[in-house]
UniProtKB/Swiss-Prot annotation:
Protein's name in the database: Autophagy-related protein 13
Coiled coil location: none
Protein location: Cytoplasm; Preautophagosomal structure
Domain of life: Eukaryota
Homology family: Belongs to the ATG13 family. Fungi subfamily.
Knockout or disruption consequences: Leads to derepression of several genes involved in xylose catabolism including PDC1, DAS1 and AOX1, and subsequent increased ethanol production from xylose.
Biased composition (Polar residues): 506-532
ATG1-binding: annotated segments: 428-487
Region entry ATG17-binding, spans: 399-407
One GO term (biological process): protein transport
Gene: ATG13
Assigned GO CC terms: Atg1/ULK1 kinase complex; cytosol; phagophore assembly site
Keyword Protein transport: yes
Length: 700
């Protein structure tokens, strides 16, 4: 059995589930017990037209009774929407559960007055009076690793719930609720109700009378109780309550309140309670004004000494409205008075009700520690003694004494000091069982009270799934790191560079060209490469129309300057001189004669004749090649042969062109035939290029 109690032993998966179920039902059952004693159930007083505020009419009848922790409270339960935060399976992120019991004043009419022990309570612009506040929390900083037997934990919780059941029935708020339920007027103007709050958020007293505000001149108007915590291997279950000690509220009409004071002169004891100077109240109006003016403190302000004592009480009055105008905590005198009040230990002092406040002065001077203070201030005092300071972002959870420096609308309640302790961020304790439990339940590393409003307790799971999705996808390649984008343009550039080097070498073999030719050659490289590709790919389409596939540029149509740009196309023939191609010298000579500025009519006629003979020879060659039974002859070869003959004949005709006879003809026909001569020369040049490239294509 000793091995079971070793701290090093971890919880199994089944044990973790059982422990989580126990802790979750602890929150739900505690809320059910408190509501059972604070809210009137439908079977008791609720009618179809009744309105009981927050939770009075929101109970639902369940199919089965909740018998957790050996306590059966009937088949009425709190709606699931009210406890949705505490029904979460992740128990490590459960926020503190706060149950607030309040007196609803919304039903009070203008001719009704709320009274507490025959004292009129000012309820203007107030709709609620907080009666008590319960705090249920799961503290991860306190644990016991040796408590590994869950039946023992369950039995301890049963004892705690019996104590809670007994305590909830003994508090003053339950007596008030029981009195209102048993009263003859079921439709009373006031009723007790309860609400559920998230303890991780600030609790303000805007529009209501908070728990820290006094309604009578009592030494202590609030008290607190704490039940023994239940230790588990991963944390401690705690229950505490802060409540008003006097809840004798009742509703009276304004006329009844005045008529009941006509016999005050015959009651000296009552008269001295309200008239400390011995002066009798002759009229009910004087009595009413005196009661209203001294509702919080029954002291007269006729003597200066009494006025000074009144100011002292107001200075240390917890949650006082008049104390909100005190200087800020940066003042030296205020800090001294606050520190002397908060760091001292309470000394019980009994103040008797007398008709004079002179005896209060030495008591207040000697024993300022006897003034009533709230639970939150006591918790803050303990934190100051241990050297801990509340962070600046937790000032909204300061004690009720700190409400002196705030407005009435932002004044917090007296239980905020406990919420500071519960919600202060602390480092995760060195608890191996807690770490094992967190890993099994996949809970986050921090509780939900430390997360922001936009945070999710399943954020880690979403992040893991996102990372797995990224790992399953292949790596992305960015364009800046990939050289494949530039492969095609680089290959084209290298091809153009090779052709440029080839043409440059060819021109150097024939001699250095002039600057004008170099410029024209550089401008026509792109068009020549495109012409060469189209010639190789479309052989048959050129037979019908020679000039359709080779569209000359705007520079090639000009005579003289544009003629040399065709030279690289013509000089391809020098690589195939053995196959019958025209020689370079004859072609160069022809181009030199042809590039002269004037063009004669004889040259034009010669060009026309050569084209006709070229066409007829091509047709005869095609006919003979079709009828022959031997190997078909390539028509391009025949076309090239006839073209060579025409070129030599036209060259001879040009030598005869220098005679006087031809000169006269030239002078007569220059004008009308100049336009036709340019077109014929262009056709001839393209025909020559066609023949030369076709020959090269055949050799390839």
């Amino acid at each position: 059995m000793s091995s079971v109690r070793r701290p090093s032993k971890l919880l199994s998966e089944k044990q973790s589930d059982k422990l989580a179920q126990i802790i979750q039902n602890f929150f739900l059952k505690a809320a059910h017990v408190i509501f059972h004693f604070r809210v009137a159930f439908p079977s008791v007083v609720l009618q179809p037209d009744d309105s009981y505020g927050a939770m009075g009419d929101s109970f639902a009848q369940s199919k089965y009774n909740n018998r957790w922790f050996n306590l059966d409270l009937g088949n009425y339960e709190i709606p699931r929407t009210e406890l949705s935060l505490w029904r979460n399976k992740d128990i490590l992120s459960l926020p503190p559960l706060v149950l607030e019991t309040f007196l609803d004043l919304r039903g009070l009419s203008s001719n009704q007055t709320l009274m507490l022990d025959d004292v009129i309570v000012k309820t203007s612009k107030k709709s609620e009076i907080v009666l008590e506040r319960w705090l249920i929390e799961f503290d991860l900083s306190t644990f016991d690793n040796e408590v590994m037997e869950f039946p023992s934990i369950y039995k301890k919780i049963i004892i705690l719930f019996r104590s809670l059941y007994l305590l909830a029935g003994l508090l003053p708020s339950y007596k008030l609720r029981d009195k209102l339920v048993k009263s003859k007027s079921k439709n009373s103007a006031i009723h007790v109700s309860c609400r559920i709050l998230d303890g991780s958020k600030p609790i303000t007293s805007k529009g209501r009378i908070g728990l820290s505000k006094k309604l009578l001149s009592e030494d202590e108007h609030t008290s607190s109780k704490k039940l023994q915590p239940i230790l588990t291997p991963i944390g401690a279950l705690r229950v505490s309550v802060s409540y008003r000690t006097n809840c004798n509220f009742q509703v009276s009409d304004n006329e009844e309140a005045l008529s009941s004071q006509f016999m005050l002169d015959h009651l000296p004891s009552v008269r001295t309670n309200y008239d400390s100077d011995g002066n009798s109240l002759t009229s009910p109006m004087d009595y009413l004004q005196n009661r209203v003016s001294s509702a919080s403190i029954h002291l007269s302000d006729q003597s200066p000494r009494r006025r000074s004592s009144t100011r002292s009480v107001q200075l240390f009055k917890v949650g006082s409205i008049n104390s909100s105008s005190s200087p800020p905590p940066g003042a030296t005198q205020s800090n001294q008075s606050v520190s002397s009040f908060s760091t001292s230990k309470p000394i019980p002092v009994t103040l008797n009700k007398t008709n004079s406040s002179a005896s209060l002065v030495p008591i207040l001077r000697q024993n300022r520690d006897s003034l009533p203070k709230s639970i939150g201030s006591m918790v803050q005092n303990q934190m100051q003694e241990t050297g801990h300071q509340v962070s600046s972002n937790s000032r909204r959870f300061s004690s009720s004494f700190g409400s002196r420096f705030r407005t009435v609308s932002s004044r917090n309640n007296s239980l905020d000091g406990q919420l500071v302790v519960a919600n202060q961020p602390f480092s995760t304790p060195n608890n191996p069982i807690l770490h094992n439990f967190r890993s099994r339940n996949k809970s986050p590393s921090v509780s939900s009270t430390e997360l922001g409003p936009s945070s999710s307790i399943y954020m880690d799971d979403d992040l893991d799934s996102f990372m797995k999705m990224l790992d399953s996808k292949p790596d992305l390649r960015f364009p800046s790191n990939s050289p494949s984008v530039y492969e095609d343009p680089l290959a084209n550039f290298k091809t153009f560079q090779k052709s440029n080097d080839f043409l440059t070498l060819e021109q150097q073999q024939h001699g250095s060209p002039s600057s004008n030719q170099i410029m024209i050659h550089s401008q026509s490289q792109t068009s020549q490469s495109q012409v060469f590709k189209r010639t190789v790919s479309s052989d048959r389409s050129r037979r019908g129309s020679v000039s359709s596939n080779y569209s000359p540029s705007s520079q090639a149509l000009r005579p003289g300057v544009s003629a040399p740009m065709v030279t690289p196309s013509v000089t391809y023939g020098k690589f195939h001189a053995s196959s019958g191609s025209p020689s370079n010298s004859s072609l160069a000579q022809y181009l030199r004669h042809n590039s002269s500025p004037p063009a004669s009519a004889t040259a034009v006629a010669t060009v026309h004749n050569s084209l006709r003979r070229l066409t007829s020879s091509s047709q005869r060659t095609n006919t003979n090649s079709t009828n022959s039974s031997t190997r078909p002859v390539n028509p391009e070869l025949l076309k090239l042969k006839s073209f060579n003959e025409d070129v030599f004949e036209s060259d001879d005709d040009e030598h005869d062109e220098h005679s006087p006879r031809s000169t006269d003809t030239k002078s007569r026909n220059t004008g009308p035939s100049s336009g036709h001569a340019e077109d014929d020369e262009d056709d001839l040049l393209f025909a020559m290029s066609d023949m030369t490239l076709a020959k090269n294509n055949q050799e390839f």
